């Protein structure tokens, strides 16, 4: 995996079944509230302890889209600085949720190359991402199909972000 951080991700180098990344994180009440706020979702189940306590869930849970936004790390890996050197377009995504996510959950996310194919001379890749809790239970899974164009991306220099 470290070679991706220096060389970038190239379609021809990826193999079906190959594990690309793993990430561990601890879910905080602020993470959940921030996700809801980012989506302009003011449903109190995501941030009001008293309201959530009276719900069928018995406490605060993350909104269904919480992990969809979180899944972006698996491709962009902002913490590991892994980058695509090729331009890709999101062609399809299927997100399956199996268990609620609560404040205090310790999650492990992993990503693999699930499928790789050509269609009409164009390259497509399907990533499989899974998130499990500290008990090893499957919390969510996403299949994310991306179309790989022939264009290269020129990344801006760090100083352009300042």
Where are these regions (language model features)?
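HotDog/MaoC-like acyl-thioester-processing domains
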Residues: 1-15, 99-162
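Hot-dog-fold acyl-thioester-processing enzymes
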Residues: 1-92, 153-162
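Short glycine/proline-centered loop/turn elements that form peptide/ligand docking sites
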Residues: 92-99
